[in-house]
């Protein structure tokens, strides 16, 4: 029993001794162990303190020397690629001694350089249009030089901000409202402000943010002012919303009619002289209008109104031409001795001849109460086409 215990203790001591020998060999062949006697073992020639090596750096430094001894002509980049692949293929148990060595170096680095703090170099983002000086390179710049370049870039950006925030000159914006010159100015200011945001690297960040907020507020106010200036007037709206009725008659009683009963809405433009415009209103089914006094209707305008009503009533079909006997009855005077009503229309014959048209119509129809008499309204309400199919074919 005692012999078995001694043998077990000897077997348990074997791996420890093996690990100690491996670590001793590693420390002997490690290049870092030879340089630790120097107080400046982790400093460069320029006085820069290097970072402590990690496990991969410790391992790759040893393996790189071996590869360089075997193949001295191999490129450094190729050696690094091979070392990276080999490190990934290593087992975790094989990485343990290098991890321990890296931890030892880290603790020694902390003891030798207690005030060390990792400060990576910040390369200032330069404007692509600005060319760097030939005498200065970003790699050789000291920390003080980097701050100077950042301040100079901040000054340039402040100049750009001032140029963007300044209001435009009165002579610069001479284009009319329809050419969208104001939009180009707003977009240009936004582009300048975006460039300024990209190249700001000064320490006074709060002041820069306040300047940016003021710049955005000014741009927004200018855009609102331009939108108010570019609002279309009533004359511009008439160009798109109204339709002109050609050869419209003189409507003396159009102002006296109500808005609900009228199909068209009269709009007169101030710049158009005496031209008359109409815009469509809601068309609803209504009964026959109440009798109104006849308006002045010239004989030449009645065929035109019948033509228009026929086109709208028939949905694009050819209009019904009035009969010759109706045309002969138009010049007659309805009231005897009326000098002022010389052009009034006597529609008694029209009412008699077109009774057949008004018998079968009880639906909706277009109404012209501004200048239509009840007889003419009943005539318009009638069917314009015969029921026979042969009558639908028109020959010209």
UniProtKB/Swiss-Prot annotation:
One of its GO terms (molecular function) is RNA polymerase II cis-regulatory region sequence-specific DNA binding. It is found in: Nucleus. GO terms for biological process: brain development; camera-type eye morphogenesis; negative regulation of transcription by RNA polymerase II; neuron differentiation; positive regulation of canonical Wnt signaling pathway; positive regulation of transcription by RNA polymerase II. CDD domains: HMG-box_SoxC_SOX11. Residues 49-117 bind DNA. PROSITE patterns: HMG_BOX_2. Keywords: Activator, Developmental protein, Differentiation, DNA-binding, Neurogenesis, Nucleus, Transcription, Transcription regulation. Residues 1-22, 116-180, 203-261 are annotated as: Disordered. Disulfide bonds: none annotated. Residues 1-13, 249-260 have a biased composition (Polar residues). GO terms for cellular component: nucleus. Low level expression is seen in undifferentiated proliferating cells of the neural epithelium. Greater expression is seen in the maturing neurons after they leave the neural epithelium. Also expressed in the embryonic gut epithelium and adrenal medulla. This is Transcription factor SOX-11. The gene is SOX11.
């Amino acid at each position: 029993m005692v012999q078995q215990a001694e043998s077990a203790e000897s077997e348990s001591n074997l791996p420890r001794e093996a690990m100690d020998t491996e670590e001793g060999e590693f420390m002997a062949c490690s290049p870092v162990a030879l340089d630790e006697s120097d107080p400046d073992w982790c400093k460069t020639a320029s006085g820069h303190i290097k970072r402590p090596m990690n496990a991969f750096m410790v391992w790759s430094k040893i393996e790189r020397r071996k590869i360089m001894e075997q193949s001295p002509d191999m490129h450094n980049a190729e050696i690094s690629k091979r070392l990276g692949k080999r490190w990934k293929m290593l087992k975790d148990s094989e990485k343990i001694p290098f991890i321990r060595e890296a931890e030892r170096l880290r603790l020694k680095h902390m003891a030798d350089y207690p005030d060390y703090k990792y400060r990576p170099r910040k390369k200032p983002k330069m404007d692509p249009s600005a060319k760097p000086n030939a005498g200065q390179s970003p790699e050789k710049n000291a920390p003080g030089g980097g701050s100077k370049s950042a301040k100079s870039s901040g000054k340039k950006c402040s100049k750009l901000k001032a140029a963007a925030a300044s209001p435009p000159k009165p002579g610069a914006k001479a284009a009319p409202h329809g050419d969208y010159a104001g939009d180009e100015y707003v977009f240009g200011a936004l582009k300048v402000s975006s460039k300024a945001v990209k190249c700001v690297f000064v320490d006074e960040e709060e002041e820069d943010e306040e300047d940016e907020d003021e710049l955005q507020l000014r741009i927004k106010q200018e855009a609102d002012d331009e939108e108010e200036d570019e609002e279309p007037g009533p004359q511009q709206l008439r160009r798109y919303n109204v339709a002109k009725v050609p050869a419209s008659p003189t409507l003396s009683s159009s102002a006296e009619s109500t808005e609900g009963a009228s199909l068209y809405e009269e709009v007169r433009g101030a710049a158009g002289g005496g031209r008359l415009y109409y815009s469509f209103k809601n068309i609803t089914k209504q009964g026959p209008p109440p009798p109104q006094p006849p308006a002045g209707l010239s004989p030449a305008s009645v065929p035109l109104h019948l033509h228009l009503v026929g086109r709208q009533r028939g949905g694009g079909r050819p209009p019904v031409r009035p009969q010759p006997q109706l045309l002969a009855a138009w010049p007659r005077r309805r009231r005897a001795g009326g000098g002022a009503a010389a052009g009034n229309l006597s529609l008694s014959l029209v009412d008699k001849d077109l009774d057949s048209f008004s018998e079968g119509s009880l639906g909706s129809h277009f109404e012209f109460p501004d200048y239509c008499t009840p007889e003419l309204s009943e005539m318009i309400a009638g069917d314009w086409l015969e029921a026979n199919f042969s009558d639908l074919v028109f020959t010209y």
